[in-house]
């Protein structure tokens, strides 16, 4: 029997990532099943289920953190999809990345943007051509 934290976490994960999140956990079953449980119980059961931030706000923070870390493209892919699933627009995702340029530099922002581009293409999402720079 799974813990209450696991049940809450799995519910949060399904709301954000649908079947994609569960697939990530399933890939760990044969090598590190406890790691999958930790992700569900701690990240989603304890952290994502807290009051005070919406799922949209949590996903913006998550994709920003993953961009900042760098080298997290698989996790960034999961959370960009999650961001879209909870109603964040592609434009807001890209604008969030652009905001990071002065703090983390072009290479990390470019890497994250290319992950987003792949996901947007897979989901047939088209961004507007407006640069939104006020010039």
Which ranges hold each PLM region?
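Acidic, glycine/proline-rich low-complexity segments that act as flexible tails and inter-domain linkers
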Residues: 1-56, 110-135
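Residue-level marker of alpha-helix boundaries and capping positions
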Residues: 35, 70-71
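Amphipathic alpha-helical segments within well-ordered protein domains
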Residues: 45, 80-84, 94-101
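Short, structured motif recognition centered on aromatic/hydrophobic residues
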Residues: 58-66, 96-97
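Extended intrinsically disordered, low-complexity coil regions enriched in Ser, Thr, Gly, Ala
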Residues: 72-92, 109-119
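C-terminal structural segments of small proteins and small subunits
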Residues: 103-107
């Amino acid at each position: 029997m799974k813990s209450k934290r696991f049940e809450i976490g799995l519910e949060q994960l399904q709301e954000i990532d649908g079947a994609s999140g569960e697939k990530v956990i399933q890939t760990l079953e044969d090598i590190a099943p406890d790691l999958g449980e930790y992700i569900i119980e701690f990240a989603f059961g304890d952290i994502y289920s807290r009051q005070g931030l919406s799922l949209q706000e949590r996903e913006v923070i998550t994709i920003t953190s993953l961009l900042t870390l760098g080298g997290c493209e698989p996790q960034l892919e999961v959370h960009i999809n999650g961001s879209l699933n909870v109603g964040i627009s592609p434009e807001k995702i890209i604008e969030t990345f652009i905001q990071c340029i002065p703090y983390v530099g072009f290479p990390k922002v470019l890497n994250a943007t290319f992950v987003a581009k792949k996901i947007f293409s897979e989901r047939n999402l088209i961004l507007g051509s407006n640069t939104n720079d006020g010039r």
